Curated annotation (Swiss-Prot):
Stored Gene3D superfamilies: Glucose permease domain IIB (3.30.1360.60)
Domain notes: The EIIB domain is phosphorylated by phospho-EIIA on a cysteinyl or histidyl residue, depending on the transported sugar. Then, it transfers the phosphoryl group to the sugar substrate concomitantly with the sugar uptake processed by the EIIC domain.
Gene giving rise to this polypeptide: ptsG
Disulfide bonds: none
First-tier enzyme category under EC: transferase
Protein name from the UniProt record: PTS system glucose-specific EIICB component
């Protein structure tokens, strides 16, 4: 049972990556536009702010589409059904809640009592995905043949959304009230404790690929800010971009991603065997630069998470502490995606105490370096370079390594589903015993996670391109 739940949660995490992928461009537009830089004409700032803001305002709908696509192998009909479901779901809530709460529609709209936020989008996406998978091959009588098959999906999804909307209108008031209480506590009353918990749990979930689910309420839901033209923004990311001075509580990510983990990478390099230092140095420096520039840290984390889990425990604790540290020092900076130098510079317009970031960051990197160095040496941990290294073939291009990966996964016929997120391949196989983990490691996988018939293979930022190359290779086999 747990394996099935884990597999489904992986699908949820993967499906949430599509909506998240629009955040960088939306965040840059909104962040720069809201900062009102002197070198930008006012009209250009307004255009950037409003276009970026429009994306954040429609995030529930975008999440509905993302969830629908994630559970239906990117079928466009499911996306259309998600749009229909979301619109009907929200309007049903708006119509029924006045009866349930004994108030008027105007009060419902003014107080956002029917605003389900991201959760409403996820529910609508789940409705359309379920209906698609159940009915996309449905046969109808000949006189209704036009509505058979996939054309039936938006219809049944919309009708189902009415029923779900009525049910949701009965249970949403206490749920919404609970979310508001948590939101106020996390964003305004005790952000130090809330974001310490966020940082610790978020890193703990990274090995399982489930951190995207945990990110959503903090990044997209907590807190509320209304700008000068009446646009309402939820979540720490959007509120910061829109100019909310109380947002920016996610700033701790810059400390451990841009400075902490690169310090750990240097420690791994410096503790490697003499004969391996050149190879490990090139790998770790490349991974450190990736973390510093983009905030993508899995290439470093998966270099030690399997062979030295105690180091990952230390890392998760330090990552969790970086968030309350920044909040305590009133250090605020915005991220659109993953806490890298690019985000840090581009979105610096609304930042606070920005010069403290490199100072605290370098100290944090030094702390990481010392702790990792001491633990590796004193406990003789088998981090990369401290054992005999076999040459792998990852230096080949994506098209060349794709056949090797397919073979290591048990061949074309053993692969039931193939997908990828930012740093890892997500695969479902027919027979897990046919998967050759050792071969995947020799190819260059930074980490491998198996649960039931699901397997995640970490190849860093090349994963999406490797997946595309594998798709082409599978078609031609």
């Amino acid at each position: 049972m747990f394996k099935n739940v884990f597999a489904n949660l992986q699908k949820v995490g993967k499906s949430l990556m599509l909506p998240v992928s629009v955040l960088p461009i939306a965040g840059i537009l909104l962040g720069i536009g809201s900062a009102h830089f002197n070198f930008l004409p006012d009209i250009l700032s307004q255009i950037m702010a409003q276009t970026g803001g429009s994306v954040f305002s429609n995030m529930p709908l975008i999440f509905a589409i993302g969830v629908a696509l994630g559970f239906t192998n990117n079928d466009g009909v499911a996306a259309l059904a998600a749009v229909v479901s979301y619109g009907i779901l929200i309007q049903t809530l708006t119509a029924v809640e006045p009866i349930v709460l004994h108030t008027t529609i105007e009060v419902i709209k003014n107080k956002h009592l029917s605003d389900t936020g991201i959760l409403g989008g996820i529910i609508a996406g789940a409705i359309s995905a379920y209906m698609f998978n159940k009915f996309y091959r449905i046969q109808l009588p000949e006189y209704l043949g036009f509505f058979a098959g996939k054309r039936f999906v938006p219809i049944i999804s919309g009708l189902s959304a009415i029923l779900i909307g009525v049910i949701l209108s009965l249970i949403w008031p206490p749920i919404g009230h609970g979310i508001q209480i948590f939101s106020k506590w996390a964003a305004y009353q005790n952000p130090i404790l809330a974001f310490a918990l966020y940082g610790l749990v978020e890193r703990a979930l990274v090995p399982f690929g489930l951190h995207h689910i945990w990110n959503v309420p903090f990044q997209m839901q907590i807190g509320e800010y209304t700008n000068s033209i009446g646009q309402v923004f939820h979540g720490d990311i959007a509120r910061y971009m829109a100019g909310d001075s109380t947002a920016g509580n996610l700033s701790g990510g810059f400390i451990f991603k841009m400075y902490g983990l690169p310090g750990a990478a240097l420690a791994i390099w410096h503790t490697s065997k003499k004969e391996n230092k050149t190879k490990i140095g090139s790998i770790m420096i490349s991974a450190a630069l990736t973390a510093f520039l983009t905030g993508i840290t899995e290439p470093i984390e998966f270099s030690f998470i399997i062979v030295a889990p105690v180091l990952y425990v230390i890392h998760a604790i330090l990552a969790g502490l970086s968030f309350p540290l920044c909040i305590f020092l009133d250090m605020r900076a915005g991220t659109s995606f993953s806490h890298g130098f690019i985000d840090f510079i581009v979105l610096s317009g609304n930042s606070h105490h920005i010069l403290l970031f490199p100072i605290i960051g370098i100290l944090y990197g030094l702390l990481y370096y010392i702790l990792f160095y001491l633990f590796i040496i004193n406990f003789n941990l088998d981090t990369p370079g401290r054992e005999n290294i076999k040459n792998n073939i990852l230096e080949k291009d994506n098209n060349e390594i794709a056949p090797y990966i397919i073979t290591a996964l048990g061949g074309k016929n053993n692969i039931k589903n193939l997908d990828a997120c930012i740093t890892r391949l997500r695969i479902t196989v027919s027979d897990i015993s046919k998967v050759k983990q050792k071969d995947l490691k020799n190819i260059g996988a930074a980490g491998i996670i198996i649960s039931g018939s699901g397997i995640q293979v970490v190849f860093g930022t090349r994963s999406e391109n490797i997946k595309t190359a594998m798709d082409e290779c599978i078609k031609n086999i």
